[in-house]
UniProtKB/Swiss-Prot annotation:
The lineage of its organism: Bacteria, Bacillati, Actinomycetota, Actinomycetes, Mycobacteriales. It comes from the Bacteria. A motif (CXXXC) lies at residues 5-9. This is Putative oxidative stress regulator AosR. Pfam families: DUF2017 (PF09438). InterPro entries: AosR. Keywords: Disulfide bond, Redox-active center, Stress response, Transcription, Transcription regulation.
Length: 217
């Protein structure tokens, strides 16, 4: 398979866990205004990230718009979240229950109702903040992408936003691929989801290299 990010160069590292895959590393540069994290993106990478992040933002906006109108929100300005568990499996992965007891399968109906009520209350209180944080990270990723291709330069704050947004993209793709921990290293050649899995691998290593750059001193 050709390098995911194009022709191999000095800034392109082999993804050893995924033979034949390549991804450009991030370079940490110390400046008077704090560290900067630099890399290069190809046109198809920019287009792919824009498409994936756009779909993610659409899901989050749809979830937010599904929240019922709360009279207290109108009075206090405090946003209330949707108390119901998302029906969409991708949103359920992005916005899981706040509390799941270890012995849930052994609980009686009354105890299960109590767990559901607790999760509903926690969703109503905290989900808007979580959705806003995910949306903000995704938007920062979009805002720092070049128009088509070229150099990337991230501040420490925007690098952390990239890590959060890319992680959400991986979670969303993981639902399509039915990936649970630990993720498989590869899928058979010719598998109908092999392209999606290649993208999942690329996002995983992109995130890993950026984390390593942030940790470097």
């Amino acid at each position: 398979m050709p390098p995911v990010c194009g022709r191999r160069c000095s800034r392109t590292g082999e993804v050893r866990r995924y033979p034949g895959s390549f991804v450009r590393k991030w370079k940490r540069v110390e400046t008077a205004n704090g560290p900067r994290f630099r890399s290069v993106v190809a046109p198809h990478e920019v287009a792919l990230l824009k498409h994936l992040v756009g779909a993610l933002l659409g899901l989050l906006n749809e979830r937010e718009s599904s929240s019922p109108l709360d009279e207290l929100e109108v009075i206090t300005g405090i946003k209330a979240g949707n108390a119901q568990r998302p029906e969409d499996p991708t949103l359920r992965r992005l916005l899981p229950d706040f509390y799941t007891p270890d012995d849930k399968d052994q609980l009686d109906p009354a105890a299960l109702d109590a767990v559901d009520s607790l999760n509903a209350a926690l969703r109503s209180l905290h989900e808007p903040e979580i959705v806003d944080a995910k949306r903000s990270a995704a938007q920062q990723l979009l805002d720092t992408l070049p128009e088509s291709d070229g150099r990337l330069e991230l501040t420490e704050a925007s690098a952390n936003a990239w890590i959060a947004a890319v992680n959400d993209l991986r979670l969303a793709l993981g639902v399509i691929l039915e990936i649970d921990r630990p993720a498989p290293e590869r899928v058979p050649a010719g598998h109908p989801l092999s392209v999606h899995f290649d993208v999942y691998q690329w996002l995983t290593v992109l995130q890993e290299y950026l984390v390593l750059a942030l940790m470097a001193t």
